[in-house]
Amino acid sequence: MPSWQGKSKGTPLGYRIFVSVLKNFGVMPAYFLLRFVAFHYFMFSYKSSKSTYDYFHKKLGYSTIRSLFKLYQNYHFFGQTLIDKVVVMSGIRNRFTFDFDGEENLRKIVTLQKGGLLLSSHIGNWEIAGHLLKRLGTRINVVMFDGEHQQIKEYITGVTGERNVNVIVIKNDLSHIYAISEALANNELVCMHADRFLEGNKTLSSNFLGTEAKFPMGPFVLAAKFKVPVSYVFAMKESSLHYHLFASELKEYTNTDKNAVMQQMLQDFVVEMEDKVKRYPEQWYNYYNFWQQ
């Protein structure tokens, strides 16, 4: 079973250093400093490096040298997503630009007044996507694991302020299910990842990059139960200061067979996820063995 534990990397001191650089010198100097941090993880974070290296080498077929280079790039891109999150959420002056392919699809979901489910994965920068979704003019709910260490979470909240979306935290008591149900019943948008699960969660299986992999059942159960429109959304970084947000055409799964709906949704999601992984291979932040059964 995949061994992801829902915890993120980093230390409070590291965040403080980068926030200080951002406030005093700007984004590009912070990116420069990030090179050394990325190299540290590249050299000394064996477990996550092995999983990511195997993804480049075994799944995408890259040579050893290219896989190592892509591994370093992956750490550097991941660090940039954390920096960009702080910049955008805290209002630090920046020169970020954005393209938004499929915005009309999300506006159509809002217009339908049926609620909607936006599914993504740990590819690109979901925080940037959440920032852009504000302009849809409707309530946005983001479902997430509470994976930050408490000290880091408190510090980041102090720097950025509270998120401009409603956060629904996944909890062991399943109270998040009721919060999601209420949001959809109120015709709101619910955003969640559909590529990771914790031990004990129910799963569905699909071929992904040539090998069978497991995906969390929860997001697909919700869509099958509430029969709300679905769009697959990703925010990808295309240059140092430019993001490209993709939102697929809305899907409405009306089949009365719940299992058939979940399988069709999963296949649609996997197609979108594979497309983004192949187009932006360095931006899949998957630091565990995704295919381990």
Language-model features, listed with the residues they occupy:
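Soluble or luminal CAZymes and related metallo-dependent hydrolases
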Residues: 13, 48, 98, 172, ...
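Catalytic core of membrane glycerolipid acyltransferases/transacylases, capturing the structured
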Residues: 65-66, 112-172, 197-202
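Conserved beta-strand termini and adjacent loop/short-helix elements that scaffold enzyme active sites
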Residues: 101, 143-145, 170, 248-250, ...
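Short, flexible loop segments at the rims of nucleotide/cofactor-binding pockets, characterized by
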Residues: 92-98, 166-171, 209-210, 255
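Proline-centered loop/turn at the N-terminus of a beta-strand
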Residues: 12, 115, 139, 166, ...
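Membrane-anchoring hydrophobic helices of lipid-metabolizing enzymes
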Residues: 1-120, 164
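Non-catalytic C-terminal accessory region of glycerolipid acyltransferases
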Residues: 135, 162, 174-293
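Residue-level "edge-of-site" marker
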Residues: 35, 69-70, 146, 173, ...
